[in-house]
Amino acid sequence: MNETIVVLLSIPGLRRQDVARMPRLAALARGGDQAALAPSFPAVTCPVQMNMTTGKLPREHGVVANGFYWRDRGEVEMWTAWNDVVQAPQIWDVLARERPGTTSAAWFGLLSKGCGADYVCTPAPIHNPDGSESLWCYTKPPELYGELRDTFDHFPLHHFWGPLANIASSEWIAASAVHAARTM
């Protein structure tokens, strides 16, 4: 049986000319197809990721920012909302409908908590009552993060964005994705 593998990578700031200096990514690109992305406005993480996973623009999928204002609670929620805020089918939803039996994964896409992908991993730190933070990831199935943590230690959230951002988070994401793909 011929197996088709589709990998959609979201690498902010990556330019086509940068790929040549990245041997593994260049090899992956040579083995498949590439498509240019024309970002929409606003060109921020959540709307652009939803553009990529739905094939729709913000006016159609409903995600117009990285945060959401919940009128009923009078609260702003940044980067942590669940997938039910997305108002258009995503690629894993279409695959499940059009190609039953296809396995899909959403790896470190924001707003992926509760999405229709078969496997999911995304940061979901636990904010404790004392103001401290416990490292954690939302995963589907729920026990997957325990396995990833046991294999790779906790996801290095503090190296994902902000002043301590560095390659450690990208290495964890790549290693965990490869591990999951090989063992799922």
Identify the residue ranges that each predicted region occupies.
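Generic recognition of stable, solvent-exposed alpha-helical segments in well-folded globular domains
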Residues: 9, 20-23, 90, 172
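Glycine-/proline-rich flexible loop or hinge segments
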Residues: 6-11, 30-35, 45-48, 67-80
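Beta-strand elements within well-structured catalytic alpha/beta cores of enzymes
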Residues: 3-17, 28, 52, 95, ...
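An acidic- and aromatic-residue-enriched active-site/binding cleft used to recognize and process polar
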Residues: 13-14, 39, 109-112
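Residue-level preference for short coil/turn positions at secondary-structure junctions
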Residues: 1-3, 30, 100
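His/Asp/Glu-rich, glycine-adjacent segments
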Residues: 56-184
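A short catalytic or substrate-binding loop motif that flags glycine-/basic-rich loops and adjacent residues
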Residues: 1, 44, 170-172
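Short, structured active-site-proximal loop/turn typified by the sulfatase FGly-forming signature C/S-X-P-X-R
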Residues: 17-60, 103-105
